Amino acid sequence: MKKVKLSLIANERSRKTSFMKRKNGIFKKLHELSTLCGVQACALIYSPFIPVPESWPSREGAKKVASKFLEMPRTARTRKMMDQETHLMERITKAKEQLKNLAAENRELQVRRFMFDCVEGKMSQYRYDAKDLQDLLSCMNLYLDQLNGRIESIKENGESLLSSVSPFPTRIGVDEIGDESFSDSPIHSTTRVVDTPNATNPHVLAGDMTPFLDADANANMNQVQYQAPNNLFNQIQREFYNINLNLNLNLNSNQYLNQQQSFMNPMVEQHMNHVGGRESIPFVDRNYYNYNQLPAVDLASTSYMPSTTDVYDPYINNNL
């Protein structure tokens, strides 16, 4: 809604229309006030647009309220009474008080900036007098008092604060990170070492032989540390060799007898490092377990092409 400019309406017809509308609005508000709040109120309006002064709620009601008001003491009547001059003087007083407060805030900011610039060696940039130096000294003393109070507080509570902090554990496993880590209670750390069994580890091992737990084992992994045995490579190669000896190639013995024999011999010989003394297939791209590496087969002596699905995986074929 557009704000109305408080000035005399130049057009007489518009002024009369506005008068009638606002007069009815005042009478409506007085009726709501007296009905909702249970107070006695009256209104008396003089206007050049009507020959007789108009009163609310009626002439008798207005006289009754006016008589009751005149019976009150003068101090009680004039306590909240205000004319135009009194209203303007009150507004001027409030504005002067606000100006005084803003001037004090600006002066404090100027002195604080002057102090920080003096610390940085920029004192020569200012033109100051004795009053400025006195204000600067007061500001510096205020900051020094705050610093000294802070130092005394740290000296008094320093030992108790340091003693309440629990020391860090010297050796921990996998830390459990959760909401409990931010509680006030001290943290108790335990480490549980689990030795890897002689059988093949069911968890997947990365290229650097660091074990990773699967999703099922993650449910209770609070500070568990796994240690692999020193002979893990020999155990894997031995398991690889034993399973390859019992591998069923599902070939027709009548049709592929020679091909099966020529395919099995190189595979067995390549992984008999601890039996036959031959070298294993060299590692390619950190492939420590010979994944997806075909055996060296003499294609000139056989017509059978080995399938890539027959390559042994120690963890996939463990459940066969």
Swiss-Prot record:
Protein location: Nucleus
The name this protein goes by in its record: Agamous-like MADS-box protein AGL90
Organism: Arabidopsis thaliana
Domain MADS-box as annotated: residue spans: 1-59
GO cellular component: nucleus
Function (record text): Probable transcription factor.
Gene: AGL90
Transmembrane segments: none
PROSITE patterns named in the record: MADS_BOX_2
Subunit structure of this chain's protein: Interacts with AGL62.
Entry superkingdom: Eukaryota
One Pfam family matching this protein: SRF-TF
